[in-house]
Amino acid sequence: MKFFALFIYRPVATILLSVAITLCGILGFRMLPVAPLPQVDFPVIMVSASLPGASPETMASSVATPLERSLGRIAGVSEMTSSSSLGSTRIILQFDFDRDINGAARDVQAAINAAQSLLPSGMPSRPTYRKANPSDAPIMILTLTSDTYSQGELYDFASTQLAPTISQIDGVGDVDVGGSSLPAVRVGLNPQALFNQGVSLDDVRTAISNANVRKPQGALEDGTHRWQIQTNDELKTAAEYQPLIIHYNNGGAVRLGDVATVTDSVQDVRNAGMTNAKPAILLMIRKLPEANIIQTVDSIRARLPELQSTIPAAIDLQIAQDRSPTIRASLEEVEQTLIISVALVILVVFLFLRSGRATIIPAVAVPVSLIGTFAAMYLCGFSLNNLSLMALTIATGFVVDDAIVVLENIARHLEAGMKPLQAALQGTREVGFTVLSMSLSLVAVFLPLLLMGGLPGRLLREFAVTLSVAIGISLLVSLTLTPMMCGWMLKASKPREQKRLRGFGRMLVALQQGYGKSLKWVLNHTRLVGAVLLGTIALNIWLYISIPKTFFPEQDTGVLMGGIQADQSISFQAMRGKLQDFMKIIRDDPAVDNVTGFTGGSRVNSGMMFITLKPRGERSETAQQIIDRLRKKLAKEPGANLFLMAVQDIRVGGRQANASYQYTLLSDDLAALREWEPKIRKKLATLPELADVNSDQEDNGAEMNLIYDRDTMARLGIDVQAANSLLNNAFGQRQISTIYQPMNQYKVVMEVDPRYTQDISALEKMFVINNEGKAIPLSYFAKWQPANAPLSVNHQGLSAASTISFNLPTGKSLSDASAAIDRAMTQLGVPSTVRGSFAGTAQVFQETMNSQVILIIAAIATVYIVLGILYESYVHPLTILSTLPSAGVGALLALELFNAPFSLIALIGIMLLIGIVKKNAIMMVDFALEAQRHGNLTPQEAIFQACLLRFRPIMMTTLAALFGALPLVLSGGDGSELRQPLGITIVGGLVMSQLLTLYTTPVVYLFFDRLRLRFSRKPKQAVTE
């Protein structure tokens, strides 16, 4: 009592305390960063290595495997995957959540250094690493276009001037420049001219390499002067290389221009980028795992004017894609929802209390509690994101509950004629323990969430802490500010005020009277109610088992990402045509705003596209509906497939896949993997629960297999190294020299001119100069035959791996898909040498599924323990917890009704319901126990009186929580797919629990009371327990 009196009789101190809480919250709000979701990115590091011309199998065995063995020893690596393709290897290291990325980067560098001696000596550079996840969608894409400059020159500007500057911006993890390659001098050899002049490809390579050198020449010096020696030892342009003498034939000079076409071109001609049908260079910017996307994008935008000033006016620099507008729009929608929820909750209070003065009290208490929470969020390092703002929206109903319970009880004493200050003190004393019980037991629900590990635990932690802090501040405000305001602001109702909203008052009285009559009947038919309660428990189990489940609601972020997978033997020219065709189909869709894409590099038969949709207000379809519409049009394109998926704020794993979910096959037997992967993929493609089934295993690339006759080679004076060098010189885009410029270094690239490599007969024109100086055709000592070869070799850990990716058709859930895949694997009878498991997001979903029931049970157990401690009873907590089955049934039925799967967001709703619906029972049980202890009433009389007496606050708190969640259900616009499942779960659970618990709780209370009396050794003390 002294605690309450301290604040009631010291209004100035109480007001200043509330002002201090509010001011701290305002300061915290201004400093909070903005993000789509809590920081849940795994620390990921990508290691890249290249060996131009090497086959995927060579890259896997000679580059990937040594690196994997060294990198696999690093502490904290949760997953290591690699992909080796023509001339390149990429290894993705995913670390545990608690691993510091900078420390991990140092360990990665040390591991690369340790493996260096095991790597091939011909690698042009050491392996490098980046602190970014290549599977993440870029947070921003910049494009460079020009009608004047070539693609190589644009790429040079992008990679030399723009990319390094952008990489230095806080939060930027990686800037990937695509669409072309650096400028280079290309030497296209004419094999017939070489043969006629008796010049080998090695002769050309050696001559060029020796003619372009950069070595120190020293200096001359006398007694008074010093002269630096400078020579014209470097050749920089094609015009300078063309007259280079490479050989003498019968005394005549053979110049490079006589046997080759020399051009100023690019390092790799098999690269193409486009934006809206126009050739472009793309700068794909990805953030660091721990970076804030909004802050990073804002920092990049702030630097754009400076960047534009560094490039010529004839180059157009544009933002082709920006992830931040939809994130900002989504957060604005949540903020509007929060404001609406506060307004609706205050309206509920006004309708019930029918007093403007009384309504002002919760209208002050709610903002103080919510605003004060921002200070704690800032101190905890949280952000303003969809989940934390949804927590505050839901908290609106919770924080007003405490104020309502105190306010309603004080108002009841005022209506009985008690003086305001006395009513405030007496009313607060009566319900102080009730409010404490409700708040502590509600916070207890979230304790298991705080202890939950992995991605779900990290994702839900901000939600749980934010809500718990809001409840804690609300508890403080409801026991300090609320009774003080009641004591000093409220007064006995006047007749004129009692007439306000008389219709609603009469309706409430009628409801209470009707409830009293129905409750009498129920208390005389307790077995029927008990059967209903048991039925709801059984129905809960059945609904939970049968309801479709997924990990996280499918978001509409306004951005689509597409992966092109073409025939494995397709040429680059044909692949570029496919990219253009797909981009035209996409660009013609009315919901599409911008399209960028690129193809080429080490995987000629693949490409990527990034599609920006129009804002939600300018289109009627969701991202998934647009994908479904485009899928039908894209299927008509022969020889290639474009797989589209909506970019999500949460993506797990480092695999670059063409669909949202992955299933990985592992085996130590590569032959078994290659045998079973096509069978499994074809089977999964027939399942109606899956869409866009594709695989990263590509074993049917066209290959020309050359078989050396070693005996003939020995007789002719030719070794294998010379023969392999011939092939690399002719067909490997071999980088044979370096041109040094002030801003960058460029390569001289040699190959047989593409005009002479249009078919297999090109091999017949190749020759080697033997040790006697004679030109020996390749056909003299080698035979060739067409064969199939892999376009890529993939590993997970140290095992061969193949990843099957898939999307979900409309109306299907991830639980449907995972169950269908498990059935298919069983039906196929896959041998034990081939192991299958879900990867990425699908893997996290499986882990979350296994822990959901345990999490719910842990929350219930925690609440039971807290209530048991508070009530010093084993029985009363069970009475209070008997309200939960009806809430569960209501929530699951509502999800089924709205065709929404059970996701992590719905799980949050279930956890919240555990805290919400027990409040009704707490209010009933508290007053019933008080009536038994001090009113000398029988248990049935006590619980009956408690139900009637608490009917109004129960209705008020339930309607406040319901109206607080209702805007989430009705909200549209950006981010609504996250908000609606939470609102649906809470509203459905509240409606059902309100209908049932008003009757089941009294029955359970009496049941446990009789049970306790039956087993008690001291029946006389049963009432005083």
UniProtKB/Swiss-Prot annotation:
Q: Could you list which ranges are Periplasmic topological domains?
A: 30-335, 380-388, 454-467, 876-894, 971-984
Q: Does the keyword Acyltransferase apply?
A: no
Q: Does the keyword Nucleus apply?
A: no
Regions crossing the membrane: 7-29, 336-353, 360-379, 389-411, 431-453, 468-490, 853-875, 895-917, 948-970, 985-1007
Question: Mind telling me which GO cellular component terms the entry cites?
Answer: plasma membrane
Q: Where in the cell is it found?
A: Cell inner membrane
Q: Which family does it belong to?
A: Belongs to the resistance-nodulation-cell division (RND) (TC 2.A.6) family. MdtC subfamily.
Q: Which NCBIfam families would you find in this protein's record?
A: PRK10614.1, RND_permease_2
Described by its record, this protein's role is as follows: The MdtABC tripartite complex confers resistance against novobiocin and deoxycholate.
| Record-given protein name | Multidrug resistance protein MdtC
Phylogenetic classification of the source organism: Bacteria, Pseudomonadati, Pseudomonadota, Gammaproteobacteria, Enterobacterales
